[in-house]
Amino acid sequence: MFDHKAPGMRVDLPATALAFTDLHNDFLSQSGKAYPLIEESLKKNNTADNIERLLRAAKAVGMHVFLSPHYYYPHDHQWTQPLTPLEDLAHKIGLLDRKGAFTLEGLEGSGADFPERYKPYLTDGKTIVTSPHKGYSTSTNDVILQLRRYRIEKIILAGPVGNLCVEAHLRDFIEQGFEIAMVRDATAGTTNEEGDGYQAALVNWRFMAHALWTTAEAIRLIKASANSEQRNVAA
């Protein structure tokens, strides 16, 4: 059995950021197309509320917040290469669909839009909303570049689909040299005939992440980092 202690992660401002994947209605709102797939896990973890708590805490101390969204445009539905099972489902049900890359027509209130409760945090002119990822990982958007440009070295990571986009981002971030702390109750997952995706994510994160926190632990450390930064400035 693997019982080696994780190294942990110190939260340092301004080198630490809070990052999310997929904060969309289709995952987090009851009317969302994928909501039924992860509903049980979302409710058990209190995921939607915990995401807002993290956003509020980060904004209160001036921590950088990054969001890696996921959108599909009409040209994405013209792909000819075979899709993965989840991509195939997404295309069939219109998950995260937008009218196009250069228009906001139909976005407001749609499945691709942000939940209203998060908009004060995500549209404040300070949150870094990257270009959309098209698969699961960071390989199809600019989130790595954006993190580098802001001199981010450590990431507190969360999002609604823990065993897919969140974990894919985790793996990429680690291989790009970032330190990562995962927030275990600010995420969720679905099940299939092979087992529980959320539990599978936790198992993998325990092997890979530098730290695995609850939302309460993450908020405590975020607040403590701000106090430490203030003391350093005063000194």
PLM segments and residue spans:
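Active-site-adjacent betaalpha module
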Residues: 1-17, 26-27, 60-61, 78, ...
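Short catalytic/ligand-binding loop motif for oxyanion handling, primarily in non-cytosolic enzymes
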Residues: 73-77
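N-terminal nucleotide-binding beta1-loop-alpha1 segment
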Residues: 21-22
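A short alpha/beta connector and helix-capping loop motif
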Residues: 14-16, 32-58, 62-69
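Short, well-ordered beta-to-alpha junction loops that form the rim of enzyme active sites
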Residues: 68-71, 160-161
